[in-house]
A protein has these predicted regions:
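Nucleotide and nucleotide-moiety/phosphate-recognizing core
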Residues: 1-173, 178-194, 201-202, 209-212
Length: 212
């Protein structure tokens, strides 16, 4: 399998941060997006940013910006589809996605996702972390892992199927990945979950503390 392209998902609405682009928030003197770029770029063959609206606000990042091709903020799957369409134009086989508000994801993300896809006709893998004891209890014992649907390996070959699913109203990532035999790559969640994302001002303060 050739080295995948990377797509950073920044197309959502940051309602819990008062709107605007979460990825442009500063964390330790560097934007969240810049931190995500620094982590993902060494792992992939090339990078693009999925974002909607005026692309000029991201001009300083030096990345191609690809907007959702499905209107109405259809969620992460629309961003994945936009990334797959871009990757198809580059002649790539697959992409790895990462969220723009998750600055601590693993530096071996891509290697472990691609390893988990070995033998798959169409590589499709989501990142997971173990649930804590409290989380298992709250879920009634259903499932022992948390799946992180914005962190995955996605095959260009299934983009038309994904487009049809989104146009048909599908929004939940794991429903689509399960339909296509998606696998999981398990990452440790100690000393903290590396897929911790910044959704609120309190989360941003916690991220600042983790940098120290």
């Amino acid at each position: 399998m050739q080295k995948p392209l990377g797509v950073i998902l920044a197309g959502g609405l940051a309602t819990r941060m008062g709107g605007g682009d979460k990825g442009l928030l500063s964390l330790g003197g560097q934007s969240l997006l810049s931190r995500v770029i620094d982590r993902l770029a060494p792992q992939v063959a090339g990078l693009a940013l999925n974002a909607n609206g005026d692309a000029a606000r991201f001009a300083g990042l030096g990345l191609p910006v690809v907007a959702d091709t499905i209107e109405g903020f259809a969620g992460p799957l629309a961003g994945v589809l936009a990334g797959l369409d871009w990757a198809a134009e580059q002649g790539a086989e697959a992409i790895v996605t990462a969220a723009a508000d998750t600055p601590f994801f693993p530096t071996d993300l891509v290697a472990r996702l691609t390893a988990a896809a070995e033998g798959q006709a169409h590589p499709l893998v989501l990142a997971t972390t173990p649930k804590s004891g409290d989380e298992v209890l709250k879920s009634g014992g259903k499932g022992r892992v948390n799946r992180h649907p914005t962190f995955g390996l996605w095959p260009v070959a299934l983009r038309d199927d994904l487009r049809a699913a989104i146009e048909g109203g599908l929004r939940k990532v794991v429903l689509w990945t399960d339909q296509h035999g998606g696998r999981e790559a398990l990452f440790e969640a100690e000393p903290f979950d590396p897929f911790f994302n910044v959704n609120t001002p309190e989360d941003l303060a916690r991220a600042e503390a983790l940098l120290r």
